[in-house]
Amino acid sequence: MSNRSGVNRRELLKTLGIGAAALTMSPFLSRALLADESSAGAGATKKVLFFTKSSGFQHSVITRKSADELSYAEKLLTEWGSKNGFDVTCSKDGSLFTPDYLAKFDAIAFYTTGDLTKDSDKYKMTPKLDADGKPMKDDKGKTIMEKGELLYKEPGMGDAGKAAFLDAVKNGKGFMAFHSGSDTFHSKGHPHKLGELLRDVSEDGKDEFDPYIQMLGAEFIIHGAQQPSVLKAVDPKFPGAEAFNNASFSEEWYSLKNFAPDLHVILTQQTEGMKGPMYQRQPYPETWARMQDKGRVFYTSMGHREDVWAKPEFAGLTLGALRWITGQVEVDVTPNIKEVTPEADPKAWK
């Protein structure tokens, strides 16, 4: 690959904040991070809103200790961005989702859960004490926790905010989501039970997907125990994807459903050898891209664990996705789901 800007591999890793040890451990990383090295620092800085509100389970990587202290993932994305031409604004405030506010950004990134139209204030959780001042246990011996002081508020975006956000993507705003971004705004009648994994269907037989799920391209069903699994890069040309080809590492892998027929699959979940009934299915999309009218959409189910965020490969894929959704690089995202994962739908499970 040509090095048009004159930035060598080691220099770019330094720019990304990735040290020499990572360079040694990841000899295949160059193409992932040099997918369009000339875009780093070239032209106007792209503005990205990183939204990490949790209306459901809040993951540790996006948990703040206080309102003003950024979480682990927020710190990393901000740092990667500042060194690569992206100005990242982090927020958990859904009330900001107005047309005027969203117009300030080139792209929006989600690490979210649940119904984001609702408020979801966060409290410090403390052990519940008995009359003697000792922590109480449940019948399984686990310490019972209760709400303590309010740490910060997470206002909902409301129906108007959700509509403004979806319109922004439709009209050309870039969008990407990590991990539980697929555990957000579920379709009507969303089931977690393994026996009810077919598409959500209304009484008249028509699919009733939430418009957010339609935009994203699929939704979360359930996950099993964290375990190693293999990914396959079915589009190694997507910036950062080749580094994950045949990679095996531990993560909280999502079992997904309701895949859009126009997905351009980038990485597939290789299910052979995985433990748990939710994974006894044929390979299915794990990372993908698609177009929502004028908007570029990217999703990866990775990102539960801190050590995954710490991987230089994950930084490379994230930056590659940011460059694509903000129009800095052009990638062929012709739909390929039928060719690369023909039995991805849950009804085709083993």
Task: Please describe what each predicted stretch is.
Residues 118-242:
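A glycine-rich, often tryptophan-bearing local segment used as a flexible ligand/cofactor-contacting loop or short
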Residues 11-33:
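N-terminal export signals
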Residues 49-52, 90, 107-112, 174-178, ...:
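Structural recognition of the beta-strand scaffold that forms the well-ordered cores
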Residues 41-45, 52, 72-73, 83-86, ...:
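Extracellular ligand-binding/catalytic regions of CAZymes and related secreted enzymes
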Residues 43, 210, 214-293:
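Catalytic beta-strand/loop cores that center a nucleophilic Ser/Cys/Thr
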